[in-house]
Curated annotation (Swiss-Prot):
It is found in: Host cell membrane; Host endoplasmic reticulum membrane. This is G-protein coupled receptor A5. The lineage of its organism: Viruses, Duplodnaviria, Heunggongvirae, Peploviricota, Herviviricetes. Keywords: G-protein coupled receptor, Host cell membrane, Host endoplasmic reticulum, Host membrane, Membrane, Receptor, Transducer, Transmembrane, Transmembrane helix. It comes from the Viruses. The gene is A5.
């Protein structure tokens, strides 16, 4: 059965119309909240400081992911499953790259390599490269999913698309995504430690507050990657791995994961303001850094 068509899968029906309707209501709420965030970042804050430009791209990627889940429920067509599955893969890689970009920008500001951190053009290049790389990875995954028609699930479940046409392909997908998340965790830890070391090497009176904020932001992102990696690894290592939809993949993951993304956005809004105030209240800043460029970079830490 492992490599058979979905038509021969003997899956337990898990469709729940009430849960499905509630899920779509929540998806509408997430999209509405995302629009509010975009309005705040663009119209109220004018993308300044530049952290809000980063978060705008992050919000757009999140909105695409939510729309992908909605489309998977209601759109029909031969290539629907391939397209929506690829969009999901694209969003995972793209959103992770944006978070790593934020951490890299933060480190460059402290390091003083780029005066004031990345400029708008640098951010645009990074986002464009991330978008292109994410698209290539999604397309490669799409080529290994199998026959597009066999990805259509012929049942009453809410889960309208299979992840692949064979268990071996599905396991490879799970392993790749797990390894990708682990790599993101490692890179996040490296950038966080380098940033914290640089801040602690100064004589800022509020340096421990700043490091605490940096650590909090990194912890939230690492926690999200750990949750994804552990869930995917658990599935990949199952001896009886099946293509059949589960309650976790159908309801729990799609409808609860947006909560963590909204939480990340709120944390960044709060911590950015808190960190900026801590920098401004540090009276010894001009004596703690070695150059005017680093002074300016520190005030623009967020």
């Amino acid at each position: 059965m492992a490599d058979s068509s979905n038509s021969s899968l003997n899956c337990t029906a898990i469709h729940d119309q009430t849960v499905l309707i509630l899920g779509q209501v929540f998806n509408s709420v997430w999209l509405f909240i995302s629009v509010i965030f975009l309005y705040i970042f663009a119209c109220k804050l004018c993308f300044r400081p530049r952290i809000y430009l980063w978060l705008s791209f992050y919000t757009l990627g999140f909105m695409l992911w939510v729309l992908c889940k909605v489309l998977q429920e209601y759109v029909t067509g031969k290539f629907k499953c391939v397209i929506t599955n690829c969009i999901g893969d694209f969003c995972l890689v793209f959103l992770s790259c944006i978070m790593l970009g934020i951490m890299l920008d933060r480190y460059l500001k402290i390091q003083g390599t780029l005066r004031g951190g990345m400029k708008d053009i640098h951010i645009g290049i990074f986002v464009s490269a991330s978008c292109f790389g994410s698209l290539m990875i999604a397309l490669l995954d799409g080529l290994h999913m199998g026959d597009s028609e066999k990805l259509q699930f012929n049942g009453t479940e809410s889960f309208k698309c299979l992840p692949a046409t064979s268990v071996s392909s599905y396991k490879a997908q799970l392993m790749f995504k797990s390894i990708f998340c682990i790599i993101c965790i490692i890179m996040c830890l490296i950038l966080t430690c380098l940033t914290a070391k640089k801040v602690l090497g100064t004589r800022l009176r509020k340096k421990y507050v700043i490091v605490g904020n940096v650590g909090l932001l990194s912890f939230v992102n690492i926690l999200l990657w750990v949750m994804i990696a552990c869930g995917l690894l658990k599935q990949a290592l199952e001896s009886n791995l099946s293509l059949c939809p589960t309650k976790q993949s159908t309801y729990i993951y799609p409808y609860t994961m947006p909560v963590t993304v909204i939480f990340v956005l709120v944390i960044y809004l709060f911590s950015s303001t808190h960190m900026k105030n801590a920098m401004r209240k540090s009276g010894q800043i001009r004596h703690s850094l070695s150059s005017p460029n680093q002074v300016q970079s520190s005030f623009r830490l967020v």
